Amino acid sequence: VHVPWFDGALLDNIVDYITYAFMPMVLLWSAGYLGEGRSATVLAVIPLVASAYQFCRVDAKTEDHLFLGFPSYWNIAAFYVVVLDLAPTAAAIVLLVCAVLVFVPIGYVYPSRTVRLQGLTLALTTLWLASYAVLLTQVPDPGPVWLAISLAYVVYYVVLSLYLTARRLRATA
């Protein structure tokens, strides 16, 4: 049903913001992973503000299907904070680095849409999702093999994102 005054894309962004930014910060803050007191609250708010900026960008997705700036993968950041049982200082470093990267024009892979190496990326993403599910069942004692598989995907994702960014910059130079 088409309702002319209803913007489904806006609703999708609202749901995504709550799911990928707000709830992960509530989890980390309420479970004590960010420490205690005012500094923990400020630390939880920083990714929320960075994500608000990211969600409002009209150029958040590039023509070659990359996210421009760190996408709001705060749920994944929170996952690793919990699985690795990071101390508040380590969690703060992870969150602050990711928050800064929101503003750095690096293109990040959109796994289901980025064309370059899509088959490999989707296969590795599927393996990563399986490792994610297994690791969730193993908290607080994650198995080293599943953790290595999971983190290897993160390395692949970052390396591919940097490669595609460099390739795009060379093409426009």
Regions found by a protein language model. Give the residues of each.
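Multi-pass membrane catalytic core of lipid/isoprenoid biosynthesis enzymes
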Residues: 1-54
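Cytosolic, membrane-interface loops and tails of multi-pass inner-membrane proteins
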Residues: 1-5, 58, 65-68, 173
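Hydrophobic alpha-helical segments and their boundary regions
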Residues: 5, 39-40, 58, 88, ...
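Membrane-interface elements of multi-pass transporters and channels
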Residues: 30-34, 62, 170
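C-terminal membrane-associated helical module and adjoining short loops/tails
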Residues: 64-173
